[in-house]
Amino acid sequence: NGLTNVDCRREAVGAAAVIPTALSLGTGAWLASRIGERLRCHQHGFAHVNHALTGRKCEFGTDRAIDAQHADLRRGWSLLNQLLQGRVDEIFTPPWNRCSQATADALCELGFRGLSRDAGAAPLRLGSLQSLPVHVNWMKPRLDAEPDLHALAAMIAEALRRESEVGLMLHHAVMTDRDFESFGELLALLRSLGVVEFVTMRSLLPATDALRRTA
């Protein structure tokens, strides 16, 4: 896998957002064996299915009742933990980076600790959830299907000027060899500067003594 290879070579850290129903037994075992200090995994929706009746795609949006969302969140968590041998962080990334207030409420009730969405997403009442925003989408600035490195550098620099913690989102399933090569070069550059620290999303979560969630 290009993502895990790049991370290991550059001593960076990553958080894989995993779709529960898309993970096979074999891939789950392979991924679980690689989870550690530098590679973490968390829940990415349930089946990555669009339930929006109109407008932009959304699996956990306002068109779904909280009971339906609650059930999918719980089932997804249970399935993911079975496949990844219990090595799942209490973080949720909604498909298409969109979710509703009902989603946040259900996540709190189930004991999740973090919610990762686009930094510009509409505000939600997060309760006990820690916001873990994405500031830069690697796949957004493109030049002829290749990464626009100048635009990416500018976006990252601007985010670093504004924020003490910057989230960079990858789409490893659709990234090209050139994407991985460029990403590896970026990691090497950032590390060489000596002023950037790579941290896991899990490390940004507040400490907790107990979780309410049940499998």
Question: For each predicted feature, which ranges?
Answer:
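Active-site beta->alpha N-cap acidic-glycine motif
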Residues: 1-40, 79-83, 88-89, 168
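Acidic-and-aromatic substrate-binding clefts and catalytic sites of carbohydrate-active enzymes
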Residues: 2-8, 14-27, 93-102, 123, ...
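Surface-exposed, active-site-proximal loop segments in enzymatic domains
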Residues: 6-15, 52-63
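Generic structural signal for well-ordered alpha-helices
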Residues: 25-32, 70-78, 104, 156, ...
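Short glycine-enriched loops at secondary-structure junctions
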Residues: 43-49
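Catalytic domains of cell-wall/extracellular-matrix polysaccharide-remodeling enzymes
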Residues: 60-134, 176-182
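C-terminal domain-boundary segment and adjacent tail
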Residues: 114-115, 167-215
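A conserved mid-domain beta-alpha-beta active-site/ligand-binding segment of alpha/beta enzyme cores
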Residues: 132-165, 169-178
